[in-house]
A protein has these predicted regions:
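N-terminal amphipathic/basic leader segments beginning at the initiator methionine
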Residues: 1-12
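Mg2+-dependent prenyl diphosphate-binding active-site environment of isoprenoid biosynthetic enzymes
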Residues: 12-238
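Short amphipathic alpha-helical boundary/capping segments
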Residues: 11, 29, 276-280
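Mobile late-domain/C-terminal helix-loop "cap" segments
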Residues: 243-278
Length: 303
């Protein structure tokens, strides 16, 4: 907990800039407090693997900076007007403000890596950071390119994995690579992260439909892929689907409790599949991923 406090303090310093406009945008964005999941993953993994305090804390900050930047850009792409109960930056200050804020945080994350004293750790983490950012961009490009009323489950899964899994695997993978764990162990973490990323995105979709900390049904009204919507459409006749394409709001009446229950089962099954891979990880690391799994199961209970 003490390390997390220090990470939060140093993270906040990255939001302190001299430009009064950028400073205001970043301040507004940083007021939407998150759960610090990525920092916790990096700190727990690095600590258990015995890596240096400096490498671990700097990497935890980097992961949170990238996540924060991704939220700014995601809100623009998805046209989400609220972020954790507050007005999104693009809605409050305009799209250019949100783009500039996100770009700044990405640049700051790369700068933060230069503060790591062990040069070979710098090189390892620089490569991973670059590849992770690219993967997130690839996922977002898929997300905005598919037509939300014609996308299939396989395409949805590809989007979910590309968009979400890098931000789950990156905090831990950085520590794995710095500790020089085997490719088999790194591959196992990658596979688990993909399953977790898919489950995480499905959960987000379900929460969108009932409006948790956001306006309900925005995936439908703004044309974003949503796993519940995909499965409801698969049950309908061509005639009804044709009507829905003309009037998407009609789909709301077709969403029933069974659709939520079916996907709660799907999410649980996905998490169980991920758990089957955990034996390939170092035993001291497994509780970290068990904790992440349990957190998603708690969100299911709320639904």
């Amino acid at each position: 907990d003490q390390f997390l406090v220090e990470v939060k303090e140093e993270f906040a310093q990255s939001f302190e800039v001299k430009d009064k406009y950028l400073s205001g945008w970043l301040k507004h964005h940083n007021e939407t407090k998150g759960k610090w999941i990525r920092a916790r993953l990096a700190l727990a993994t690095g600590g258990l693997l015995g890596l240096s305090y400096q490498t671990v804390t700097k990497w935890a900050i980097v992961c949170e900076l990238i996540h924060s930047a991704s939220l700014l850009h995601d809100d623009i792409c998805d046209q989400d007007t609220m972020r954790r109960g507050k007005t999104a930056v693009w809605k409050e200050f305009g799209v250019p403000a949100a783009i500039c804020s996100g770009d700044y945080l990405i640049a700051e994350s790369f700068r933060k890596l230069t503060e790591i004293e062990q040069g070979w750790h710098q090189n390892i983490l620089l490569k991973l950071l670059s590849n992770s950012v690219k993967a997130i961009v690839f996922g977002q490009s898929l997300d905005v390119s598919y037509e939300h009323l014609t996308i299939n489950k396989g395409q949805y899964r590809d989007i979910a994995i590309e968009k979400t899994s890098p931000l789950i695997s990156m905090p831990m993978m950085g520590m794995f690579r710095c500790k020089e764990l085997s490719d088999l162990e790194c591959d196992a973490l990658e596979e688990i992260s993909k399953e977790f990323g898919y489950a995480y995105q499905c959960l987000n979709d379900m929460e969108n439909l009932y409006g948790k900390e956001q306006e309900a049904y925005t995936d439908l009204t703004k044309g974003h892929p949503n796993i519940i919507v995909i499965n409801v459409l698969n049950e309908q006749s061509e005639d009804i689907n044709s009507q829905i394409k003309k009037h998407p709001s009609k789909l709301i009446k077709l969403i029933e409790k069974k659709h939520y229950l079916n996907w709660i089962t799907e999410i649980r099954n996905t998490l169980n599949e991920a758990e089957k891979i955990m034996h390939r990880l170092p035993i001291i690391i497994r509780p970290i991923l068990e904790s992440l799994k349990n957190e998603m199961l708690m969100r299911i209970k709320i639904i």
